[in-house]
Amino acid sequence: MSQDVNELSKQPTPDKAEDNAFFPSPYSLSQYTAPKTDFDGVEHKGAYKDGKWKVLMIAAEERYVLLENGKMFSTGNHPVEMLLPLHHLMEAGFDVDVATLSGYPVKLELWAMPTEDEAVISTYNKLKEKLKQPKKLADVIKNELGPDSDYLSVFIPGGHAAVVGISESEDVQQTLDWALDNDRFIVTLCHGPAALLSAGLNREKSPLEGYSVCVFPDSLDEGANIEIGYLPGRLKWLVADLLTKQGLKVVNDDMTGRTLKDRKLLTGDSPLASNELGKLAVNEMLNAIQNK
């Protein structure tokens, strides 16, 4: 007999691999995860056939987020936020390269994996080797960026691990500078827009000042996520708050699956935006290729 959802614990689940670290509570996972996504098919299967243009994904290599109360949240990149947009891109014909800050393996929130979703699972299996042996971002910058680079877009998936290191990385800053200077796309969602904070490092103002973005609502990280035991405490800083202080305009204060295009910056508000963000990225990239 299945357990009633209201009987599930709202206490975060201890992660025995680390001191004072916790996974989300059973109750929160019942609310935030599902065996399938809203994937409803690929719109442009095989539409890109030339083979030149690729996607550079900057993924998280750190699992633990240290919180205000000294506890750690055991996290990673959210599998739906990573793999569903990539499914649309790969099925359209774009290859994907994976990079992390140090070249260490990508960390995923496997507890959020939709185990009955063929689109997500098949993409995970195709990328598994690259996720375990990613490129070092500094090497990508040195050897593969420039005006003639084969990367048409930079993709930064979410999951709370995106708030660790990536927002303070000079390598991420250089990558975003390159994308902006060379008219390439920046695609990100949920907590992934924390990476955009790096654009303002050691500068009087961010080159992204004035851009509009969707991002995971601070109000949920400050409220419901703690109340239902998804987070074991408060984050030390909030993504939307700091983006706003850098002059970006956060257009949402809720989680509805909203996506947004502002010039070459494509954003989504949460895992609920993964499917539509993937479609948006494919459409925009194909249009850009046609107009080159």
UniProtKB/Swiss-Prot annotation:
It is found in: Cytoplasm. The active site is at C190. InterPro entries: Class_I_gatase-like, DJ-1/PfpI, HchA, Prot/Nucl_acid_deglycase. Its EC number is 3.1.2.-, 3.5.1.-, 3.5.1.124. Keywords: Cytoplasm, DNA damage, DNA repair, Hydrolase, Stress response. Disulfide bonds: none annotated. Residues 1-23 are annotated as: Disordered. Pfam families: DJ-1_PfpI (PF01965). Residues 1-12 have a biased composition (Polar residues). GO terms for biological process: DNA repair; methylglyoxal catabolic process to D-lactate via S-lactoyl-glutathione; protein repair. Protein and nucleotide deglycase that catalyzes the deglycation of the Maillard adducts formed between amino groups of proteins or nucleotides and reactive carbonyl groups of glyoxals. Thus, functions as a protein deglycase that repairs methylglyoxal- and glyoxal-glycated proteins, and releases repaired proteins and lactate or glycolate, respectively. Deglycates cysteine, arginine and lysine residues in proteins, and thus reactivates these proteins by reversing glycation by glyoxals. Belongs to the peptidase C56 family. HchA subfamily. This is Protein/nucleic acid deglycase HchA. The gene is hchA.
